[in-house]
Amino acid sequence: MEALRSRYLDNGMLDFLLKEREAGRIRNLGFSYHGDIEVFDYLLSRHDELKWDFVQIQLNYVDWRHAKEVNTRNTDAEYLYAELVKRNIPAVIMEPLLGGRLSRLNDHLMARLKQRRPQESVASWAFRFAGTFPDVLTVLSGMTYMEHLQDNLRTFSPLVPCTEEEFTLCLLYTS
């Protein structure tokens, strides 16, 4: 909370950003959440006043219910997303592949996914999981190679959301 206060509140930065949005120089004002749940909850508690246009959160099928196992500062994406939905704030999704880890699964898990959708990449499952939620505005993806871009285009054009069974299968990976 102290960093938020010193960087954005006490020095008038947030007020400045709000005025810039009001003047039309900022179209969409939001924030990217990284770790301190007190800051997240505080900023959302002020949504009626601040009118966030979006919030960027980390969401993938590991972080959905097991974020603290990845990093003790993290908060489960299920909670973060639910809080955004309550306030009708669109979500921008970062880390849908958990830093690439969800594109490189062990052979057993990969086989289970390939059995269901043989033509799809393992990465596409993580992207489809993140894109399944109705209040997701966009899913960010870091791409290194042309084949990553092509796979992403196949996955998102058009996006086929996970079925309930596929959603559950993704969550089984974390069990």
PLM regions with names:
Residues 113-116, 138:
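Short, glycine/charged-rich beta-strand-loop motifs at protein surfaces that mediate ligand recognition
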Residues 1-93, 97, 105-109, 117-118, ...:
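Glycine/proline-rich, positively charged
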Residues 98-99, 146:
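Short Gly/Pro-enriched loop/turn and capping motifs at secondary-structure junctions
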Residues 121:
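C-terminal active-site-proximal or functional interface alpha/beta core segments in diverse enzymes
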